Structure formats: C-alpha cells, structure tokens
Amino acid sequence: MRGTKFELDEQKASKLSGMSVDEVWNFINQKAKEADLIVVKNGEYHAKGNSKDQSNLAIFIFDELFEIDWFTKSVKTWEQFYDDEIVEDIIFILQSNMAETSK
C-alpha cells in the first residue's frame, strides 16, 4: 500500500488559512479525494492499489499541498510510504527544492 501521512500544526494552519480547524481538514481531505486517494483519517491518505497510485500521490503531494503556502508553513512531519515503510521524507524534499530554487 502506498500513501502519505503528516502531522499538522492545526492552530497555525487555521490562523494562516483563515479557516477553522475543521474547514482546514475538510479542504485537505477534499484535495485527497480529488486525487483519487483514500482518506484513512485526517493526515493519513492511501492510494487505491492500482496503476495510478504513484501519479495520484504525486498530484496530491506536489501539485496540491506543496503549492499551499499555509500548509507548507504548518506541516510538522510529512512522509510518503510504501507497505508501511517510510520511503521519503517530504519535508526534506521540500527544503532541498527550496534551497535549489533560491540559488
């Protein structure tokens, strides 16, 4: 099973987004559904086990969440996994990309 999970500073996300905590999670969960992912719980999303898993996760992570300023400033931990093994630390990838673009 492929997926992603993260821990969010809910109060910070709420403040930066101008939404309530419930609205923040509803927004994120809707983005996951639009990327055809399974919402396991707030902050944990699984792919459906088909040929589009990797692309659906990439859409959710990089095309959706990565582009939301209040999200990237509020996320505490963020990992992508495969069969319950951590594959990538998304925060490390984001920081590396930011460092590259600022050169």
Predicted regions and their residues:
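Basic nucleic-acid-binding interfaces
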Residues: 2-8, 13-103
